[in-house]
Structure formats: structure tokens, C-alpha cells
Regions:
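Residue-level signal for alpha-helix termini/capping positions
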Residues: 2, 6, 92-95, 148
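Active-site rim elements
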Residues: 29, 50-61, 73-78, 140-146
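C-terminal cap/loop subdomain of S1 sulfatases and analogous C-terminal strand-loop tails that border
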Residues: 18-27, 62-67, 71-133, 138, ...
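Histidine-centered active-site microenvironments of extracellular/periplasmic hydrolases
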Residues: 2-55, 99
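An amphipathic, aromatic/His-enriched active-site/gating alpha helix that lines ligand/cofactor pockets
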Residues: 146, 150-153
Length: 172
């Protein structure tokens, strides 16, 4: 890009898949709402923001942020139908707080909400999981059944989708 003269005005975005589980939580596929199945790298480099170069934003985001963020960084109007929010302010200053938690969905009615500390999962059958990433980064201890976490569950449940899209036919 340096030779083309475009390095100074090209935003670079790199993200990746997470690969398969290799037996974690007795699971060998990648179709799950746990951290290992959803934590993927995301790198956004804006050459106009040199102060943030090489800095890491530790707040979880989901990939619905990509399109709104690129619109924002390019100075284009936001598209109101987008589910995601721009994280352009975190590209400029990675220490800034993200306005909403990351949301993941797998299958019909199965969702997870990930905040800095917690992952809350609610399945279509009503079962729940809650993990404290400060004390349990591998998500071995489901806290959802413990009364002292009721408020945390309620706060995270507010971010769950209110409606579900019809599933694709024959989707595994």
C-alpha cells in the first residue's frame, strides 16, 4: 500500500474464524455460545488515528459492529436498520467504554450476551448459563442457578433479542 500511495487513507480490517473445539467442555464442534466458540480476533487500523496504533480494546464486541464502524470512520451516514453499533470511538481510543454488550446467536432462540465480566446464555428451552470471566475464564462454573446472581441475569437478559428470525431450512 505504501507504493500505491494509499496507505494514508486506507482502513484495514482483519477478523478471523475461531476454529473447532478440541474437547473443551466435552464438545468437539464449534456450534456453541461459549467463549471459545465466539472469541475471534478483530483488528481495525485507521491510519488517521496514529495514537491508537498497537493498542488493544479489551471490551467485547460482536461482528455486527463492522459495517456501522466502517460507515462512521468513512464519514458516511449511519444505516438505521443496522443491529450493530459503531465502535469508531474505540478505534480512536481503545480504553473507551462500549455502549452495548456483544450478542451471539446460534440456532433459533439461543442467544448469549457478553459483557466485560460476564457471559449470559439463554437457550430456546429456557435454560440459562452465567459465567464470571473474572473468576472463571474457561466457563466451567455455571452460576445461573444461584440466587445472588439474579440481578446480573436480569441486567443481561435485557439485551437479549425480543424477536427471532425464522431459521434457514436444513441449517445444522
Amino acid at each position: 500500500m505504501d507504493r500505491s500511495g494509499q496507505a494514508g487513507n486506507t482502513i484495514i480490517v482483519v477478523w478471523s474464524d475461531h476454529g473447532f473445539h478440541l474437547g473443551e467442555k466435552e464438545h468437539i464442534e464449534k456450534f456453541a455460545l461459549w467463549e471459545k466458540a465466539n472469541h475471534v480476533p478483530l483488528i481495525i487500523v485507521d491510519p488517521r488515528k496514529p495514537k491508537s496504533a498497537g493498542r488493544v480494546c479489551s471490551s467485547p464486541v460482536d461482528l455486527t459492529c463492522l459495517y456501522p464502524t466502517l460507515l462512521d470512520l468513512c464519514g458516511l451516514p449511519a444505516y438505521p436498520a443496522n443491529d450493530g453499533l459503531s465502535v469508531a470511538s474505540q478505534v480512536s481510543d481503545p480504553s473507551r467504554t462500549i455502549a452495548k454488550p456483544a450478542l451471539m446467536t446460534y440456532g433459533f432462540g439461543n442467544h448469549a450476551v457478553r459483557t466485560q465480566r460476564w457471559r449470559y446464555i439463554r437457550y430456546a428451552d429456557g435454560t440459562e448459563e452465567l459465567y464470571d470471566h473474572k473468576n472463571d475464564p474457561n466457563e466451567w462454573n455455571n452460576l445461573a442457578g444461584e440466587k445472588q446472581y439474579k440481578k446480573i441475569i436480569e441486567e443481561h437478559a435485557e439485551w437479549m433479542p425480543k424477536t427471532n428470525a425464522k431459521p434457514f431450512e436444513n441449517l445444522r
